[in-house]
Regions:
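The beta1-alpha1 cofactor-binding region of Rossmann-like NAD(H)/NADP(H)-dependent oxidoreductases
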Residues: 56-66, 99
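Canonical Rossmann dinucleotide-binding motif of NAD(H)/NADP(H)-dependent dehydrogenases/reductases
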Residues: 2-32
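Active-site helix of classical SDR
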Residues: 117, 153, 161
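Short, small/polar-rich loop/turn modules that mediate ligand/substrate recognition or access, typified
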Residues: 169, 174, 240-242
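Short C-terminal tail/terminal secondary-structure segment
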Residues: 88-91, 142, 230, 241-260
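Residue(s) in the substrate-gating loop at a strand-loop-helix junction
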Residues: 137
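Substrate-binding pocket helix/loop in short-chain dehydrogenase/reductase
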Residues: 92-94, 98-106, 210
Length: 260
């Protein structure tokens, strides 16, 4: 990977996306992020003045189109795409999932990835080399009780990834999915609180259940995910394609608190 690369990271102003963006920026790459949250964008740009940004809701096609108009105006090219935008969705049994929450989760986690990829792929193809990393989840590798919108969207991400890898391989573009386990931070805290409420347990009890899923008995760090993404976009990782790579401390199995 050379410093001439232009990299787009969706939901790049906070969390995993910010870690990824700052890792690429450290090498002197050109980084453009998009995010729905203007406050997060301003904070990111204040700390990373060499980066550029667009305020974008990836679930809205017209906003994604505007995002790529920005990229074309600023850089005129794109080498690497990191599809990171996603939300956790509702925590409830499938019969209690609000239809609008299902639609919102699929809209951001899957439709948004499709919209962004649709615009990005022609730009990357022109270079006859490049990388795409789609952020899925260990929830895309197994079922997860009370998380049907999220799990369904993340399974779909892996299917999209494998298909893109087949289509783009002849252009020397590798495409992979990175599947984080529970990542320490605000999102898992919100999920834990929702599960605790639904199950009549304390947040500490639910947190312990989640941590017991992993052989390492801890949550992974956002930096762990960023390091894997960076490797897959480097020369050393370029022959890896079409894979769904878990970064999860080895998930041994699902939590069983629904049986309590």
């Amino acid at each position: 990977m050379t410093v001439a690369n232009v990299i787009l990271i969706t939901a790049g102003a906070s969390g995993i996306g910010r870690y990824i963006a700052e890792l690429f920026l450290e090498e002197g790459n050109a980084v453009h992020i998009c995010d729905i949250n203007a406050e997060y964008i301003n904070s990111f740009l204040k700390c990373n003045p060499k980066a550029t940004a667009s305020q974008t809701d990836v679930s809205k096609y017209d906003e994604v189109e505007k995002l790529f108009q920005d990229i074309d105006k600023i850089y005129g090219k794109l080498n690497i795409l990191i599809n990171n935008a996603g939300i956790a969705g509702a925590s409830a049994g499938i019969e209690d999932i609000p239809v609008d929450n299902w639609d919102k989760t699929i809209g951001i986690n899957l439709n948004g990835m499709f919209y962004v990829s649709k615009f990005a792929v022609p730009l990357i193809k022109v270079n006859k080399s490049g990388s795409v990393v789609n952020i899925s989840s260990t929830a895309g590798l197994m079922g997860v009780p009370n998380r049907s919108p999220y799990a369904a969207s993340k399974w779909a991400v892996i299917g999209l990834t494998k298909t893109m890898a087949m289509e783009l391989g002849p252009f020397d573009i590798n495409v992979n999915a990175v599947c984080p386990g529970c990542v320490d931070g605000d999102r898992i805290e919100r999920v834990i609180k929702a599960d605790a409420k639904n199950q009549g347990k304390t947040a500490k009890e639910i947190e312990a259940v989640y941590k017991r899923q992993s052989s390492m008995r801890r949550f992974v760090k956002a930096g762990d995910i960023a390091s894997m993404v960076h490797f897959l976009c480097s020369d050393r990782g370029h022959s890896i394609s079409g894979q769904a790579i878990a970064v999860d401390g080895n998930t041994e199995g699902l939590f069983n608190w629904l049986d309590d």
